[in-house]
């Protein structure tokens, strides 16, 4: 079955092409740390021959606690992104939270991301669509895979069909997430075979029901990522940190930066194996 290709500059993203890595840090903690993390990702992905897009947030507007670190903000964040692009020649993805942010952010980065908690906000979707940028839609934890087609339709009605879908798990009772491996193919089907990627980092979240910050299951990142890659996906979304225990956001789910290369070697091997198989139709 023909898969839709979404192009991010010279990077082609599709479910039957070699996977694209969307990775970096959760939030911009500082200019120097962003440079360090981006350089490491670029070095490793170039060595392994993996197409790469750097990810970081300039504002974490959905933190649980009013006291949690949010990021440097729009103006300073865009300055850091511009320096990263000039220094490393890297593509960049970041999220927007308000309609007014869509165009200023799209003027700087290559992919704008619709956060899971905001994925049904029509005004935000319309503003993002109007930019003409490539869009990454995070599937809300409370939305079924089949409902993602409605969000894609909103973007198409807004004149933008350059949409990538991203799963980051589904609510499993209170304060826990699970990943439905059958949901990936449903998301492909309802979106006209748009590229589907897997955010393994945020799928590992598991919070203390009375705490102010998300916990995580970093020790299980490799096994969950292996399972997702075995489905046959367009890309993998993963955040890393040189010192996860002291990261300012989602450290418990972050891959230790030093483990990035061996981790990606495994992901690439699985991706190549699975996409080398003949497509088998078992529906009849």
Curated annotation (Swiss-Prot):
NCBIfam families associated with the record: KDO8P_synth (TIGR01362), PRK05198.1 (NF003543), PRK12457.1 (NF009109)
Pathway annotation: Carbohydrate biosynthesis; 3-deoxy-D-manno-octulosonate biosynthesis; 3-deoxy-D-manno-octulosonate from D-ribulose 5-phosphate: step 2/3; Bacterial outer membrane biogenesis; lipopolysaccharide biosynthesis
S-adenosyl-L-methionine found in the keyword field: no
EC number: 2.5.1.55
Pfam families listed in its UniProt record: DAHP_synth_1 (PF00793)
InterPro entries associated with the record: Aldolase_TIM, DAHP1/KDSA, KDO8P_synthase
Source organism, top-level taxon: Bacteria
Source organism of this protein record: Escherichia fergusonii (strain ATCC 35469 / DSM 13698 / CCUG 18766 / IAM 14443 / JCM 21226 / LMG 7866 / NBRC 102419 / NCTC 12128 / CDC 0568-73)
Catalytic activity entry: D-arabinose 5-phosphate + phosphoenolpyruvate + H2O = 3-deoxy-alpha-D-manno-2-octulosonate-8-phosphate + phosphate
Keywords per UniProt: Cytoplasm, Lipopolysaccharide biosynthesis, Transferase
Main location: cytoplasm
Protein family (similarity comment): Belongs to the KdsA family.
One GO term (biological process): keto-3-deoxy-D-manno-octulosonic acid biosynthetic process
Cytoplasm in keyword set: yes
Record's subcellular location: Cytoplasm
Enzyme class: transferase
Name of the protein in question: 2-dehydro-3-deoxyphosphooctonate aldolase
Encoding gene per record: kdsA
GO MF terms, alphabetically ordered: 3-deoxy-8-phosphooctulonate synthase activity
One GO location term (cellular component): cytoplasm
Parts of the chain that traverse the membrane: none
